[in-house]
């Protein structure tokens, strides 16, 4: 009896967990000739979550998003959308499932001969909904995206940001469970990008909408995502909470993608670093959480007086978590000093790397 109860409880927990997953990919593979576009992708997206998938051009992002909406067929693996595996479905069977998936693109794909409200209502017209119901839904969505006064306008009169808002409204027309965003802000200027990201975050909060973002811009992930997955050569090489990945990138590609938005060693110092011991060892120090607030260096100074000087760095806040990166110089007069400093910092959860020696510092 106890065994039966235990088994039933486990099954119930498993079903409950599955119901919270809008997307689950397991070992998904897709090849084009000899090229592995997707090479064993596994990830989940929970209901109401915003997941950012980031990678360089050619990493497999576009193939992944096409597999998610059934436009591309995976060679193997499972792709579950709300618990249903779509990999074996016929084109006819895919149609109702696609209505559960909205999509926005880099290019807005609006019909120039249709008004804004007609563009938004188009998916509902295809479904056969009555005109009055279509327009009612279109007006609700235009209110949501801040374009209620543009219902009768034509796309040619809209700015790029306004066109993308129409695209978002159209993607939400059929009340999808999942919104896919394929580089939706890459053609927009920085200010418009921020406004579109704020809109998506607001929609996520108001509707509980699950969003999967494909992008090559870390700023987009930083501004909106709950979690991030880094894709490279068709594989997920790193995944985690955005603040954690930003604070402590594990994969080389992640560090490279972060270069533009994390503090970097000034070029005039980086250019003269040497592997040979010089007058100062240059260390990078990455911190997250309470230690990132700066007290750690006061502790280091007290424990090891005159052991370092601060060269460069800064503190940021991501998902309400302080994240910091600093560069310090440690005198090489005592060969063991850099090791002592590194040991002190790593014992307090800092990520430390000796970058080289500044031989020109007096």
UniProtKB/Swiss-Prot annotation:
Subunit structure comment from the entry: The complex is composed of two ATP-binding proteins (MetN), two transmembrane proteins (MetI) and a solute-binding protein (MetQ).
Swiss-Prot/TrEMBL catalytic activity: L-methionine(out) + ATP + H2O = L-methionine(in) + ADP + phosphate + H(+); D-methionine(out) + ATP + H2O = D-methionine(in) + ADP + phosphate + H(+)
GO molecular function terms attached to this record: ABC-type D-methionine transporter activity; ATP binding; ATP hydrolysis activity
Task performed by this protein: Part of the ABC transporter complex MetNIQ involved in methionine import. Responsible for energy coupling to the transport system.
Signal peptide: none
InterPro entries: AAA+_ATPase (IPR003593), ABC_transporter-like_ATP-bd (IPR003439), ABC_transporter-like_CS (IPR017871), ACT-like_dom_sf (IPR045865), MetN_ABC (IPR041701), MetN_ABC_transporter-like (IPR050086), NIL_domain (IPR018449), P-loop_NTPase (IPR027417)
Cell inner membrane keyword on record: yes
Enzyme Commission number: 7.4.2.11
Protein species of origin: Rhizobium johnstonii (strain DSM 114642 / LMG 32736 / 3841)
Enzyme class: translocase
Domain ABC transporter: 23-258
Residues annotated as binding ATP: 55-62
Source species, domain of life: Bacteria
Primary localisation category: membrane
Membrane topology of the entry: Peripheral membrane protein
Name the record gives this protein: Methionine import ATP-binding protein MetN
């Amino acid at each position: 009896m106890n065994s039966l109860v235990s088994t039933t409880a486990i099954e119930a927990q498993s079903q409950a967990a599955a119901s919270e997953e809008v997307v689950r990919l397991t070992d998904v593979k897709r090849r084009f000739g000899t090229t592995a576009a997707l090479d064993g992708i596994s990830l989940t997206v929970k209901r109401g979550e915003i997941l950012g998938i980031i990678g360089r051009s050619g990493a497999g992002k576009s193939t992944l998003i096409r597999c998610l909406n059934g436009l591309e067929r995976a060679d193997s693996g499972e792709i579950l959308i709300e618990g249903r595996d779509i990999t074996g479905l016929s084109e006819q069977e895919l149609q109702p499932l696609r209505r559960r998936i909205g999509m926005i693109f880099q290019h807005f794909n609006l019909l120039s001969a249709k008004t804004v409200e007609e563009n938004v209502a188009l998916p509902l017209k295809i479904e056969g909904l009555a005109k009055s119901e279509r327009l009612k839904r279109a007006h609700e969505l235009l209110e949501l995206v801040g374009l209620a006064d543009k219902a009768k306008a034509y796309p040619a009169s809209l700015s790029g940001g306004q066109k993308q808002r129409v695209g978002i409204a159209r993607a939400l027309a059929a009340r999808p469970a999942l919104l896919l965003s394929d580089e939706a802000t890459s053609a927009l200027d920085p200010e418009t990008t921020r406004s579109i990201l704020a809109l998506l975050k607001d929609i996520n909060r108001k509707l509980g909408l699950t969003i999967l973002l494909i992008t090559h811009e870390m700023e987009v992930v930083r501004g909106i995502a709950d979690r991030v997955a880094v894709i490279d050569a068709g594989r997920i090489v790193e995944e985690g909470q955005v603040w954690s990945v930003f604070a402590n990138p594990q994969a080389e590609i992640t560090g490279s993608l972060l270069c533009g938005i994390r503090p970097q060693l000034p070029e005039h110092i980086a250019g003269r670093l040497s592997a040979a011991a010089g007058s100062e060892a240059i260390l990078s120090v990455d911190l997250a959480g309470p230690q990132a607030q700066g007290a750690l260096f006061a502790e280091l100074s007290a424990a090891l007086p005159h052991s370092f000087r601060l060269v460069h760095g800064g503190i940021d806040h991501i998902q309400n978590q302080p994240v910091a990166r600093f560069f310090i110089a440690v005198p090489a007069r005592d060969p063991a000093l850099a090791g002592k400093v590194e040991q002190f910092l790593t014992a307090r959860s800092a990520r430390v790397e000796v970058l080289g020696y500044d031989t020109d510092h007096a």
